[in-house]
């Protein structure tokens, strides 16, 4: 049993690439938690894709024992949380599970948008925050300027910020001392009924679902029968332990402690992040506050390039869903692409990560249709339909109005590029909410429609600011707008995978750009092919792909003109018939390129 005053629970908050996972590695290394021979970079990021992209996707915990200068040994529980906006709910749960945060800021780059988003979550969770300036060994580091920036932008005292270099190990002992002296100890009652927060869970092929927990009150022992308060599931505890980062079994976990349990849970879906775990008999009365199931925000279709791989794709998606409860999927068929799945994601990074994992870990070539968001379609008969896929749009005559999701986007940008960023946001139908300056950087807050952001906003933002802008967003609700469904017809056949929802004012430009692009991408056939963009029955843009021509009169030497005429008429009749029955093959690259467009 560990004395509560000897425990410190903390998380590390940072923007991508500011050195969060490296600092975690150093803390683990310095305290000898992992033997030197087992040490590897980004130790807590267990997926290859996390290491490769340098991002953390799932929350991970590690227990570190640290003999402090005051002669006592402290137990430090670190949660390494994701830094990206798509995983904001995982971050908020992890924040609730700890009492303090280390705010890591790159001393050469300063405060970024995601630093802000995550710090505000830490402040909301009443955290004690210790600022840490990383990368002070770089020639470009300006610790004093960044200190001022932290005070101006975030509003917390940075005069005692710890200066470190996680790469070389400078200042790491000071961080450990700051954790012990400046962060608060957890509170909790050992004799109260068990209350533990479910911080995260993942699927292990040997153990089933492994659940990361933080005990708030009471004690949990191996062999106890536990109950999930939100889902109602009851399970016996098979194993109980802590991560050092390897799994180490222990007999019990008391208040303030973090660890893992396994309880023959079959699916990750049965364990909701943020749920409350208690004993099935004499359990807690009330669950912990603040739980909300994660809702997918972005939808897109995933289809195998080779239709024979459909079964492999189904198995792969089901395996991934075991480990990711926020990822939803259902089967769909498309006339153009065959069988596939309509999948829901928390955001664009989540979509890319899942797609990369399917292609890399399961070796499946995928076609991804245009990402779309959920529209609320209010019908004239007062009912409301959630529209996930533009191809399923109800009859326009029966629709009263359509509402689209809006987001509040916070963009931090050097003021040299501010004009370009404002123009980009205006082009995407944004409404400016706020504009403030901190030193040489501007912070812009915009209200933007999510469907304008979802496709290539982030890429465009990075290109107009040469990569210097950082971006973060949160959902703020739905608003009515003049939205229409635009279809693309190739050879008079609608191509369902290219249907998109657009704003009426921008439909024509978008339609024209799309048909021009398709004209370049679709290979020529023996007959001419009209490519049209249409709203309802009205064609708004058209291009014609001319036919390949075979010279049928080549073998006529001199002779009668009517002989040539006869051959040409015969060819014309053949082409007409061909056009009537011919199928136009649209190559895979054309789908992706036609949907990725500026404007």
UniProtKB/Swiss-Prot annotation:
Location(s) in or outside the cell: Cell inner membrane
Membrane topology: Peripheral membrane protein
Metal-binding in keyword set: no
GO biological process: positive regulation of translation
MF annotations from Gene Ontology: GTP binding; GTPase activity; guanosine tetraphosphate binding; ribosome binding; translation elongation factor activity
EC number of the protein: 3.6.5.n1
GO CC terms: plasma membrane
Catalytic activity: GTP + H2O = GDP + phosphate + H(+)
The entry's keywords: Cell inner membrane, Cell membrane, GTP-binding, Hydrolase, Membrane, Nucleotide-binding, Protein biosynthesis
Every tr-type G domain range: 5-187
Disulfide pairings: none
The keyword Secreted belongs to this UniProt entry's keyword annotation: no
Binding site residues for GTP: 17-22, 134-137
SUPFAM superfamilies from the UniProt entry: EF-G C-terminal domain-like (SSF54980), P-loop containing nucleoside triphosphate hydrolases (SSF52540)
Function (record text): Required for accurate and efficient protein synthesis under certain stress conditions. May act as a fidelity factor of the translation reaction, by catalyzing a one-codon backward translocation of tRNAs on improperly translocated ribosomes. Back-translocation proceeds from a post-translocation (POST) complex to a pre-translocation (PRE) complex, thus giving elongation factor G a second chance to translocate the tRNAs correctly. Binds to ribosomes in a GTP-dependent manner.
Family, per entry: Belongs to the TRAFAC class translation factor GTPase superfamily. Classic translation factor GTPase family. LepA subfamily.
Protein name: Elongation factor 4
Organism: Jannaschia sp. (strain CCS1)
């Amino acid at each position: 049993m560990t004395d509560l005053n000897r425990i410190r629970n903390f998380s590390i908050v940072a923007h991508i690439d500011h050195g969060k996972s490296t600092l975690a590695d150093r803390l683990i290394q310095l305290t000898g938690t992992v033997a030197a021979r087992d040490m590897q970079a980004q130790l807590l990021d267990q997926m290859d894709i996390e290491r490769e992209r340098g991002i953390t996707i799932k929350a991970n915990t590690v227990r570190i024992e640290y003999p402090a200068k005051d002669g006592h040994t402290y137990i430090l529980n670190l949660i390494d949380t994701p830094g990206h906006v798509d995983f904001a709910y995982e971050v908020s749960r992890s924040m609730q599970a700890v009492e303090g945060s280390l705010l890591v800021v790159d001393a050469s780059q300063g405060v970024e948008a995601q630093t802000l988003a995550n710090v505000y979550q830490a402040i909301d969770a009443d955290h004690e925050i210790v600022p840490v300036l990383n990368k002070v060994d770089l020639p470009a580091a300006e610790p004093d300027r960044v200190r001022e920036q932290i005070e101006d932008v975030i509003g917390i005292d940075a005069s005692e910020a710890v200066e470190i270099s996680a790469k070389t190990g400078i200042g790491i002992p000071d961080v450990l001392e700051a954790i012990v002296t400046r962060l608060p100890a957890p509170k909790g009652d050992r004799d109260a009924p068990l209350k533990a927060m479910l911080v995260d869970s993942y699927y292990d092929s040997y153990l089933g679902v492994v659940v990361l927990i933080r005990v708030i009150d009471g004690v949990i022992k191996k062999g106890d029968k536990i109950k999930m308060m939100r889902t109602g599931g009851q399970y016996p505890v098979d194993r109980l332990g802590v991560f050092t980062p390897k799994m180490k079994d222990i007999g019990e976990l008391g208040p303030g402690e973090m660890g893992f349990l396994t309880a023959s849970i079959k699916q990750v879906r049965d364990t909701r992040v943020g749920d409350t775990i208690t004993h099935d008999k004499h359990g807690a009365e009330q669950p912990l506050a603040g739980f909300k199931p994660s809702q997918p925000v972005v939808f897109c279709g995933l289809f195998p390039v080779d239709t024979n791989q459909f079964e492999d794709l189904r198995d792969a998606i089901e395996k991934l869903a075991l480990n990711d409860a926020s990822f939803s999927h259902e089967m769909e068929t498309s006339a153009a692409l065959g069988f596939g799945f309509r999948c829901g994601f928390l955001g664009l990074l989540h979509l890319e990560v899942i797609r990369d994992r399917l292609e890399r870990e399961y070796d499946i070539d995928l076609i991804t249709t245009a990402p779309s968001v959920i529209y609320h379609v209010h019908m004239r008969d007062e009912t409301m339909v959630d529209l996930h896929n533009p191809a399923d749009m109800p009859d326009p005559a029966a629709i009263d109005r359509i509402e689209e999701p809006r987001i509040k986007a916070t963009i931090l940008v050097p003021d040299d590029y501010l004009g370009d960023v404002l123009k980009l946001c205006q082009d995407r139908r944004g409404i400016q909410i706020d504009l403030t300056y901190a030193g040489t950087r501007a912070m812009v807050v915009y209200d933007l429609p999510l469907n304008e952001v979802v496709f290539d906003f982030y890429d465009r933002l990075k290109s107009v600011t040469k990569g210097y802008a950082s971006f973060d967003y949160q959902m703020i609700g739905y608003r009515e707008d003049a939205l229409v469904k635009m279809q693309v017809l190739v050879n008079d056949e609608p191509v369902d995978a290219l249907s998109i929802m657009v704003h009426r004012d921008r439909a024509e430009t978008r339609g024209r750009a799309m048909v021009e692009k398709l004209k370049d991408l679709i290979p020529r056939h023996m007959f001419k092919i009209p490519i049209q963009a249409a709203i309802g029955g009205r064609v708004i843009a058209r291009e014609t792909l001319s036919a390949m021509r075979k010279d049928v009169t080549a073998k006529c030497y001199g002779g009668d003109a009517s002989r040539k005429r006869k051959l040409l008429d015969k060819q014309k009749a053949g082409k007409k018939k061909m056009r009537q029955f011919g199928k136009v093959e649209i190559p895979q690259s054309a789908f992706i390129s036609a949907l990725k467009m500026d404007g």
